[in-house]
Amino acid sequence: MKKYLFIILLALVSLSGQAKKPKQLVILHTNDTHSAIFPINPQLPDTMKADRGGFLRRIAMLKEERQRHPDLLYFDSGDFWQGSAYFTMFKGEVEIGLMNQMGLDATTIGNHEFDFGLENMAKMFKKANFPILCTNYDFTGTVMEGITKPWIIIKRNGVKIGVFAVCPKMVGLVSDKNCKGVKYMDPGKVALETATMLKEQKKCDMVICISHLGWNSNRGEDDQYMIQNSRNIDLVLGGHTHTYMPVMEYWNNMDGKPVSVDQNGKSAVFVGKMIVNLK
């Protein structure tokens, strides 16, 4: 498990004027777990990946982490489907069933969630006991209408956290028949509007963007594009490009302020663990 410690300076003002102890959040993050129900082949030549990951092992790890940090947050950045015979045979039901045991605070939609079409996506997503966020797809008029949420607010350890999600352009990634009627919206514009609303109108102390845009993607509208065209985002939990970040990356927003970004390769070989101190 990777581990980061970073400090976010936010205006958590005490009305009494008395100094308060810093608030702390523990955040776990996975991305692109790709139906890896069991750990990766132990005979794999790449010893960094061999016999690691897997949905079942992650359930056990999360239970252990919650014993140490009962208030932890856990987010996933999409593409939890596609990559094993379990998905081919059961079309996502196995993955959703196991994710229901993980206490997910939210996930989002990756391009592979479209692989069996909107009807299957709607059917399986209705079985989820966790929020599935997507802010820049408009599902109006499709079977997916009303199933996802554009954003949520979580209150944890005295901190008000706004969470939203941005997903990739479907052209070139998703078959036209599998996303018919879905409208894609510019992630930079949507991120700016949503993060500003969460910070200024909803008065969130922290704003997290769950992203499946990718890091250094050759498609243009990636995490860097989204960050530099927005403000009010404190943390980006990324996915899609299977980028392994041994340390957090940073990219400046439209005001020149660095935004923290995490991504963890694929198959939950690594789980990002962030300890956030809010002053």
Q: Over which residues does each language-model region extend?
A:
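Intrinsically disordered, low-complexity segments enriched in small/polar residues
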Residues: 1-2, 182
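A periodicity- and composition-biased signal for non-globular, repetitive helical segments
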Residues: 8-9, 64
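Hydrophobic h-region of N-terminal signal peptides that target proteins for export
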Residues: 9-17
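Sec-dependent signal peptide recognition
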Residues: 2-8
